[in-house]
Amino acid sequence: MSVKKISEAILGVGVDDTTIDLFESQYPVPTGVSYNSYVILDEKTAILDTVDNRATEPWLANLTEALAGRKPDYLVVSHMEPDHGANIARLAALYPEMQVVGNAKTFLYMDQFFGADAVAKERRVVVKDGESLSLGTHTLTFVLAPMVHWPEVMVSYESSEKVLFSADGFGRFGAVARFDKNADWASEARRYYLNIVGKYGPQVQALLKKAAALDIATICPLHGPVLTGDLSKYLNYYDLWSSYKAEEPEKILVASASIHGHTKAAAHTMAEKLRAKGAKVVEMDLTRTDVSYAVTEAFRCGRIVLACATYDGFLFPPMETLLTHLKTKNFQGRTVGLMENGTWAPMAAKLMRAELDGMKNITVCDAVVTIRSAANAAAEAQMDVLADELLAK
């Protein structure tokens, strides 16, 4: 990414990272990720956020080009997480007259990351919810957004151009240069939201209510493309995702964790039975699918079938991983069917139910499919019963 002109006064100076394989050291990003940063040029010059250490040098080059000899007056810190805040201390050292804008928690975390001497007290501008900063013809109003998805997060609204600088909100996996505007924005925005921010639905809902009072023409997130045009579709997605409602309530996810293939084969048979009854079904092999994709599909669907082998008296680990992630992300309000396999002591259904009992408003079907080694006619009969119960919910 080079300098991107968002308007005459607002420039994007972010950087694409196409060599990263795992975002937050856990989420695959096959098309990379962007670290976005912005500059507002007015009587006063403001930089909004820095970038990850992986992108420091190209970001500084973009910044130098955008500033064109100016010295920045302010650095606004929306989010202290290192993929955005890693270069705060370096920028403060490069521009010793620059003031740093954040809220009280921003500076608490800044001191924890860099030490209290990185940004001297007299250089700090501590803002509260609803306070504004005039740059000249441009004015930034700060809206605190705690736990979207860190406690110190705040977004900034520029009123003259109706721009919302949304921090991690409305972010998306994928390098911006590789994003086709005709492509599906929601696919990787959904996976980003549900895995990064998904736990904090009530906090996102609160922020959406604040945003509804603003006249927004452009959204500038810290990851992914700048959003313009009809913004209602993006806002509607966020309203849906943060409410924990199923995006496709009639769709069923059949997810299997199979050691030698027999549980997966049984899960496929179950999926085919559901399809034969008119259901829309997606199958996922948890041993071959990263958990972030499975979490995303689980939230997207209204009903789920979990098929798992028993392993050393516990759940086969890929299923345990999925259930742990779902619980962490506040998964709720779904109907779940259970299938278990075990050659001598099948226990997976009991163990999965125990995990699901710790989640909110989860309905577990009474019918359970129990397989001993490989599915037979008796197991298939149980599948028919489970399919009917699941579709009746």
Where are the language model's segments positioned?
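Conserved beta-strand hairpin/beta-sheet module of binuclear metal-dependent hydrolase folds
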Residues: V3-E65, V155-E158, K162-F165, T263
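Metallo-beta-lactamase
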Residues: K4-E8, G102-V153, Y200-A206
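Active-site metal-binding motif and surrounding structural segment of the metallo-beta-lactamase
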Residues: E43, R54-V101
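Active-site neighborhood of phospho(di)ester-bond hydrolases with catalytic His/Asp-centered motifs
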Residues: L48-T50, P72-M80, Q99-N103, L164-D168, ...
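Short acidic active-site motifs
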Residues: N87, D290-A294
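FMN-binding flavodoxin-like domain, especially the glycine-rich phosphate-binding loop
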Residues: V176-D180, D184-I219, H223-V226, T269-M284, ...
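Short N-terminal or domain-adjacent regulatory/targeting segments
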Residues: C220-E248
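Short, charged N-terminal beta->alpha structural module
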Residues: A255-K277
